[in-house]
């Protein structure tokens, strides 16, 4: 193990012990925000600390086995060789695990997220495909034990959606789904196509981390324009006080969020504000991300909805991820929520890029 990496690990272990001590401090326990923040840091440090301690134990075992290999007794030497082999294999495995654990963590990865699906080019077929994608992600969430809740939706005339925003709640939801942001293209024969010709349509996906209330940006009420309208209508402001749908415009950025899925205007406003905050923060992070590596930008997307990341070809039962040149012929399984074969290779590529960057720093 490189000396620089060992120093980093020893520093993390020291911080782990410090946080462990702080969590028992009455002053910290009395401050719920500080206690939650330290608890989150403690859980993040615990895994790398335990892994490093296991690595150190293996190094001790290796030294002991190497000393035993110098014994006069042939049987002891043979036993020592077996232990040396096991220790070296364990050392290599733990070194790999530690390198992955040292990859800088995105603080948002463990959070819930908002999944936004918008129909793009392709007319009614794009709206139908948006509905297919929402069903696909709903099935995936179900397999992961996550909960998915519709925040806002605009149905299209022939089925599906013009736009759908859903909240996905569950451990690591954002960290897994963030790689889905970008353009999704479908190639298939629409049900309304009498000539049997393959049409190409598209949808765009945006995945935004849910921001905890304590971390929400300050949004001045003077920066907001709030309109109400009838949920069943196409929008527009009405005098009728029973109108429960909400449209919020953030004037400085021009960001617009609508929510009309709840009967309560208060609930719709609360939902819309949470999505608005996530969008504002995502836009700021996208600006900062302009300096990241090309690989990271390709995998996570630039924030531009036009970035095409995936094609779903129905005639060939093919799904292609254009970021890593991956093609699988399991379209039906994918549309039923079996996304692991698509997401995991992208995550591994992303980790490999970060490991390479870590190696350059050391």
From Swiss-Prot:
Protein name (record): Peptide chain release factor 1
Gene: prfA
Principal cellular location given in the protein's record: cytoplasm
UniProt similarity note: Belongs to the prokaryotic/mitochondrial release factor family.
Protein localization: Cytoplasm
Xref: PANTHER family: LD18447P
One term of GO molecular function: translation release factor activity, codon specific
Cellular compartments per GO CC: cytoplasm
InterPro entries named among the record's database cross-references: PCRF, Pep_chain_release_fac_I, Pep_chain_release_fac_I_sf, Prokaryotic/Mito_RF, RF-1
Positions of modified residues (N5-methylglutamine): 237
